Amino acid sequence: MRTLDKRIAPNVKLAASLVARAPTLTLAYDARCKSRLAATLDTGEDVAVLLPRGTVLRDGDVLVADDGALVRIAAAPETVLLVRAADPLTLMRAAYHLGNRHTPVEIGDGYLKLEADPVLADMLRRLGTQVDETHAPFQPEAGAYGGGHKHGHDATFAEDYALAQQVFGEHHGHAHSHDHDHDHDHDHQHGPGCTHGHHGHDHH
């Protein structure tokens, strides 16, 4: 069994013909968050994926096998919620509330996309958005600071959270104090934009 153990950096330009000839490995978002997994290429060949911890694969990424061959990553269609709104402010409000919950979100021109979740779907409808369940590839935003989403109250997280609480409190006309001085040493990391640990940690 071949092992895919290197990812070519996104800024490295490969010849289009080389990439076009490479077999594809189609994975859903959850699988693309895993740095170690057994998978099957679209050609039917079984392979092992062994990448640095924290790696999150995106559609179009190119991996290198231990024999030097290239494999192209494709985002598999999966069940997602497609969120639209009649005006930009409503969509922004929806994005804000999803961000408060550390929900992975794909942001597109006039829409948000997230993994299917009936509780979040209900919340989004209450906010005035149109929510449709559909089957499509899911490519959420990567971490804004490049290092991936941390389940920890590090300095950046604490500052962002305090600011979000302040904005939330002002918007609702009351101060919503939440003290995060307590020490939660949860600095494990799933990679840019990957936050599946909120529904049960799956460390690979």
Curated annotation (Swiss-Prot):
Gene Ontology molecular function: nickel cation binding; unfolded protein binding
Transmembrane segments: none
Superkingdom of this protein's organism: Bacteria
Disulfide bridge partners, by residue number: none
Annotated Basic and acidic residues bias: 172-190
Subcellular location per the Swiss-Prot or TrEMBL entry: Cytoplasm
GO biological process entries: protein folding; protein-containing complex assembly; urea metabolic process
Spans annotated as Disordered: 172-204
One GO CC term, this protein: cytoplasm
Principal localisation: cytoplasm
Keywords noted in UniProt: Chaperone, Cytoplasm, Nickel, Nickel insertion
Function: Involved in urease metallocenter assembly. Binds nickel. Probably functions as a nickel donor during metallocenter assembly.
Family named by the database record: Belongs to the UreE family.
Protein name per Swiss-Prot or TrEMBL: Urease accessory protein UreE
Organism: Burkholderia orbicola (strain AU 1054)
